[in-house]
């Protein structure tokens, strides 16, 4: 007997997972069933060893290991289905009824208790298919004391989809963790992973995040449908004057262009659209991202990795030694990255990046708070695009109405103006909205603004100086309200800070 882990990957576990875990015994056999090995702990019952001998039908080679090593072996061996599950999901069809499957699943305490994991795999297939059908960006699987809740984020808003059996929580979470190659035995710490799937012929990238909670693990799946996004400036919903000005900015030879907004406001899509416009054989375009969301042909993309100290700052330094013309930094999070980005722009590079600020003018204050001197900021910054995403009205069921005096006062429009509000039909799943579009504010750093920044003018001072020349996000949104693209309530929802 030894305490060394068995290292025979060609052997597969034979006993049901529930028995193996309860009795702390692993029976491993090859396809020819001529070789049988047992991995157990010193306290494994003799009856369990006899049962393993009976099932194997051949002599056993027994290895004793520590409880910790046994747990590791157990998880590793019973993750046998990870590749099989991936193959099962290689091309998920559209004929699976998510709701019926959830009702029909048998009760079970653990994903691997039975011989067949197919029902839970089918449920996950159906859940993913349903999410893609509704163009959901995220799936939330949340465990509470008395129920399990599945919600989809559709057009930026969470919607409850299903409340399946509470007992399904561990099955769903465990299977998803297996598919994302996470540690199913570790439930005390958050884990992150990803998987690539094909659903209805579409390539879907899924980012998986787990988080321990008081009633079990919560899981969020971020879905990235690589076929659904048009990476060009014309598809962003920009007003024509903003699009033309941004197009001019990104063709400047050097300087910094920033895109600001909260998480989920479409900043990455805007930057990728800009890179797609610039992408040519005459330019060396390089990125450092967290993570790489879209793979762009002809562009060198690097992903940050904190585990090996591959930060934005370190990646940016390395990129600048690769003779780039255009550099994309996924996000400026700290003063070090900001300083390197500014220096890069001053030495002949065009730098594109994002900041988490609510407005375009807020980017000026944020960079100065990070230690960028006003004279450097005024010299390097070309422009700042602030943006939000609003839901667009379903054109099949939107309904016109005439605003009253109170609504006129709220919107600043004339009483009697015709606007639209959501209806509800089969095409929009009775929500009244279908898809999203951007609303924007583009701050151009012209000579007037540059001088104000250089002299340390405040954010409020620059706003007053610009006056009516500044078209805010809310004003841009109001133009889309007048055009019947969205509603005033949607614009207010995403611009409350203004």
Swiss-Prot record:
Pfam families from the entry?
GSPE_N1E, T2SSE
Compartment(s): Cell inner membrane
What are the annotated GO cellular component locations?
plasma membrane; type II protein secretion system complex
Q: What is its EC number?
A: 7.4.2.8
Q: Which family does it belong to?
A: Belongs to the GSP E family.
Subunit structure as annotated in this protein's UniProt entry:
Forms homooligomers; most probably hexamers. Interacts with OutL/GspL.
Q: Mind telling me what this protein is named?
A: Type II secretion system protein E
Species whose genome carries this gene: Dickeya dadantii (strain 3937)
Q: What is the lineage of its organism?
A: Bacteria, Pseudomonadati, Pseudomonadota, Gammaproteobacteria, Enterobacterales
